[in-house]
């Protein structure tokens, strides 16, 4: 588990995307990623307007939106990301052969590679998924892109454990510049081999313990103390009538204080 500061890690990271993200985290004093699964662009943009100042990263599932368009959804999202200084992460969870994911990432309705700074993929199909996605990014844009591998999940009964997790970590080692880290519940090591992987952890909640569909929540302190660099919070920010601005600051503060404790800068 890294005890270096985000600023220190930004200065030495081989990935431009990861370095930019670490710098944003340092400058805004936040390690909060907002996961906003809503059905309309209007709802999405309203929540982003409220949460933008508190987050380092926005995680989307644009295939949930009933009215998605590049002009009506992506353009204003990119404007908000510039206004409030956060990156965009499309939680696509690619899981197919290299040529197929290359097309899914670059083409179709969503053209993810054009606008999302970060996306993610399962390791189930092997290292070809990394090379396919990287090729797509290089062909579509000159902007740097980053990939997260799904090493562990937060849902009850997940099969992403043990040898599967180990195999996914091995796949991540195939490309130090493009693969920037993992969706995981804990530190994934690698520093002794020269890797500085970002760990992003979903299933973080200060109030709820889970839901009826198998989601299991862990506290902010728990995930950060076991190696998470970025806490991913969804319904805890806006569901059940919650005030997104209030909850955004609450989670930002909790995440930042947990990070300072991990780095030895706060008791």
UniProtKB/Swiss-Prot annotation:
EC numbers on record: 4.1.1.23
Catalytic activity: orotidine 5'-phosphate + H(+) = UMP + CO2
Xref: CDD domains: OMP_decarboxylase_like
Annotated effect of mutating residue 93 to A: Reduces activity over 100000-fold
UniProt keyword annotation of Acetylation present: yes
Highest rank taxon of the organism: Eukaryota
Active site, per annotation: 93
Keywords recorded for this protein, A-Z: Acetylation, Decarboxylase, Isopeptide bond, Lyase, Pyrimidine biosynthesis, Ubl conjugation
Example GO biological process: UMP biosynthetic process
Signal peptide: none
UniProt binding sites for substrate: 37, 59-61, 91-100, 217, 235
Pathway: Pyrimidine metabolism; UMP biosynthesis via de novo pathway; UMP from orotate: step 2/2
GO molecular function, one term: orotidine-5'-phosphate decarboxylase activity
UniProt cross-link Glycyl lysine isopeptide (Lys-Gly) (interchain with G-Cter in ubiquitin), position: 93, 209, 253
GO cellular component terms given for this protein: cytosol
Pfam families, sorted: OMPdecase (PF00215)
In-chain residues carrying the UniProt-annotated modification N-acetylserine: 2
Entry's family note: Belongs to the OMP decarboxylase family.
Name used for this protein in its record: Orotidine 5'-phosphate decarboxylase
Gene name for this UniProt entry: URA3
């Amino acid at each position: 588990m890294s005890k270096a500061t985000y600023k220190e890690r930004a200065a030495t990271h081989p990935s431009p995307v990861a370095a930019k993200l670490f710098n944003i985290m340092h400058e805004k004093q936040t390690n909060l990623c907002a996961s906003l699964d809503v059905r309309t662009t209007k709802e999405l943009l309203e929540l982003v307007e409220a949460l933008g100042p508190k987050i380092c990263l926005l995680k989307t599932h644009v295939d949930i939106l009933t009215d998605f368009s590049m002009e009506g959804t992506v353009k204003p999202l990119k404007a908000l990301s510039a206004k409030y200084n956060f990156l965009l992460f499309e939680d696509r969870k690619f899981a197919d052969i290299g040529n197929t994911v290359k097309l899914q990432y670059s083409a179709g309705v969503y053209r993810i590679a054009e606008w999302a700074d970060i996306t993610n993929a399962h390791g189930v199909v092997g290292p070809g998924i990394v090379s396919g996605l990287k090729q797509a990014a290089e062909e579509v844009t000159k902007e740097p892109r980053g990939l997260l591998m799904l090493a562990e999940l937060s849902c009850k009964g997940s099969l992403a454990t043990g040898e599967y997790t180990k195999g996914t970590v091995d796949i991540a080692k195939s490309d130090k510049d493009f693969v920037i880290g993992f969706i995981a519940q804990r530190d994934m090591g690698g520093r002794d081999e020269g890797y500085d992987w970002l760990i992003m952890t979903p299933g973080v909640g200060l109030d709820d313990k889970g839901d009826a569909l198998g989601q299991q929540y862990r506290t902010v302190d728990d995930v950060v103390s076991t190696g998470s660099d970025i806490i991913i919070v969804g319904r805890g920010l806006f569901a059940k009538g919650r005030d997104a601005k209030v909850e955004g600051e609450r989670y930002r503060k909790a995440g930042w204080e947990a990070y300072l404790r991990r780095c030895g800068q706060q008791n």
